[in-house]
């Protein structure tokens, strides 16, 4: 049986996620130098509300959205009950901060972050993660993003990243395209300190295998709160150095067209596969905030084929497939030889 969360669990997680929203927005405004976030507060008829912040047409970001929400309800959607049937019949509470950034320059990756907390009767859990979607990737940028999140996980438990990295690869996968959305990062869900770390549906996947090797989780509520805090704080150091390196990199209409084409994959994932989008729409969430993740511009092209050994081909042949980004020496050698390391 789960241990009860602290009496102030809801207020504590709410404050953590509000602070995360503030820090991220401040950091992004500083690096953009031109754009400013506009805030819109909203209330939900069934209980709760949030604040949506969007930056448009900055010097770096074509569109950046950082949302906070805190919502309550009486009827849980089927998508939650199917995962945690013991929550059925209980009033529920959910709070989260989510972010999607769509930069102008195709050499700066799109990035997504989400950290959340949920309670319903005897059930509670933390979830979250961050993932990077480059269009013209460099291995050094990919490594920095992964390494910062690995360090954040290991502050709480040395084993978590071994599960969260492959879980991210598994979750952000477009089954209808048979490719990853990007180069991954970390992803976790339904973390309540009981049972195995992995709580996904693919019991034959790499995340499940890693979790089985590790065994049962012994993390408590405070550990999982610290995990969300550490991982949230890891975002800016994982991403801002990429902006600083790539913001002045020149690009042509060809790279811009490819960026818009690949953004189409982002749209496809978010509307077809993403559980957060589905949960928000099923619970009468604020549609504008839920769909904030979509890029302002995207395009589709029938039967697109990249030129052999081009940067565009390297994206689909290497950087949309799960890799051991931090340790694979053959991958490092290939990237150096093809000028896509740094």
From Swiss-Prot:
A divalent metal cation binds at residues 102, 112, 146, 176. It catalyses: coproporphyrinogen III + O2 + 2 H(+) = protoporphyrinogen IX + 2 CO2 + 2 H2O. GO terms for biological process: chlorophyll biosynthetic process; protoporphyrinogen IX biosynthetic process. Pathway: Porphyrin-containing compound metabolism; protoporphyrin-IX biosynthesis; protoporphyrinogen-IX from coproporphyrinogen-III (O2 route): step 1/1. Its main location: cytoplasm. Its cofactor is a divalent metal cation. Involved in the heme and chlorophyll biosynthesis. Catalyzes the aerobic oxidative decarboxylation of propionate groups of rings A and B of coproporphyrinogen-III to yield the vinyl groups in protoporphyrinogen-IX. Homodimer. This is Oxygen-dependent coproporphyrinogen-III oxidase.
């Amino acid at each position: 049986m789960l241990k009860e969360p602290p009496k102030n669990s809801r207020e504590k997680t709410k404050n953590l996620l509000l602070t995360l929203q503030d820090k991220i927005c401040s950091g992004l405004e500083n690096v953009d130098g031109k754009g400013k976030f506009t805030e819109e507060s909203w209330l939900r008829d069934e209980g709760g509300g949030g604040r949506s912040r969007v930056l448009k047409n900055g010097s770096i970001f074509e569109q950046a959205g950082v949302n906070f929400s805190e919502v309550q309800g009486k009827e849980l959607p089927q998508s939650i009950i199917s995962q945690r049937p013991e929550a059925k019949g209980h009033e529920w509470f959910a709070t989260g901060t989510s972010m999607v950034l769509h930069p102008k320059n195709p050499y700066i990756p799109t990035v997504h972050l989400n950290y959340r907390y949920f309670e319903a009767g005897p059930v509670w859990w933390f979830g979250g993660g961050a993932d990077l979607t480059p269009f013209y990737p460099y291995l050094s940028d990919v490594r920095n993003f992964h390494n910062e999140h690995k360090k954040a996980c290991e502050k709480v438990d040395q084993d978590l990243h071994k599960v969260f990295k492959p879980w991210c690869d598994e979750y952000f996968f477009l089954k209808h395209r048979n490719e990853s959305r990007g180069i991954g990062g970390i992803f976790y869900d339904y973390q309540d300190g009981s049972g195995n770390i992995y709580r996904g549906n693919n019991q034959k996947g790499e995340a499940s295998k890693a979790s089985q090797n590790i065994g049962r989780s012994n993390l408590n509520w405070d550990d999982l709160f610290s995990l969300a805090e550490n991982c949230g704080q890891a975002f800016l150091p994982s991403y801002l150095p990429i902006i600083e390196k790539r913001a002045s990199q020149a690009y042509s209409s060809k790279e811009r067209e490819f960026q818009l084409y690949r953004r189409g994959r982002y749209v496809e994932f978010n509307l077809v596969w993403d559980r957060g989008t589905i949960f928000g729409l099923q619970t009468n969430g604020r549609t504008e905030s839920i769909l904030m993740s979509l890029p302002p511009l995207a395009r589709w092209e029938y039967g697109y084929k990249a030129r052999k050994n081009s940067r565009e081909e390297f994206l689909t042949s290497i950087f949309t497939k799960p890799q051991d980004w931090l340790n694979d020496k053959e991958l490092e050698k290939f990237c150096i030889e093809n000028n896509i390391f740094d």
